[in-house]
Amino acid sequence: GDVYKRQVYYRESIMIEEVVSVELPVHERLVVRKNRLMNEENGIDMPRISIVTGTHGDELDGQYICYEVIRRIEREKNKLKGIVDIYPDINPLGLDTGSRGIPMFDLDMNRVFPGDNNGAMAEYVAAGIIEDIIGSDLCIDIHSSNIFVNEMPQVRINDDTQEKLLPYAKMMNAQFVWIYSSITVLDATLAYSLNHLGVPTLVTEMGVGNRITPMYCRDIVDGIFNLMSHMGIWDDEPKEVNEPIISTEGEVTFLTAKESGCLLYTSPSPRDTERSR
């Protein structure tokens, strides 16, 4: 389809920019935007962090995290000494329809990176996203789990980037850091592509698909601000964060039900007890 030129919108310290866009049928466009937060008075040569989410349309925790990061920065924007680029939705069609992949194509957005400027629509969009993120000092790729698994806040890194990324991962206020073998990592993911293009990238995972878990989200937001303080992006004292468990390959287990069925409490559930209070 036709490619549209970037458009930039300004609102106080927030600059909303079109990263990449493609024409769709019936006079519509697929548009990926980013919010850039910065204090222009600090100059151009500033540390930069990119926060990316919305790769899968059924993962909503990242939406809350992006909102909360923007809200806190706007509340005390005089403390912002660097550049914060927020990509809240890199799979707009998936988020609009609540589907994990890209509708119509049944394609996982996290399997087309680094993309191709001359490729099909998904590959073209992926290439535009990668090109825009390159130059960041750090990227955080935020995911939720699927609808069948509830995961505690965690940071995932592979073993060939462990030396560079583990210090950052420990600052993220996650409950554990999962270091896994690079052999099991698909090279078409956003994180793999960025790490191999020179942008240190952390993957965070938490919660359940199609839901928002505010407690987990707030923990990760605190971790992001702690990380930004250490990077010189946020002028404030680093936050106290969890000391995560460091897990390597073979040390992580998923607890799953052996039988299908319906869970019934024989006594009031913790939620009902809390409501009665």
Residue ranges and their predicted role:
Residues 188-237, 251:
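Active-site-adjacent mobile loop/cap segments within catalytic or ligand-binding domains
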Residues 34-45:
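Short beta-strand-to-loop junctions in surface cap/lid or active-site-entrance loops
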Residues 56:
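Conserved phosphate/anionic-ligand binding catalytic regions in large, soluble enzymes, centered on
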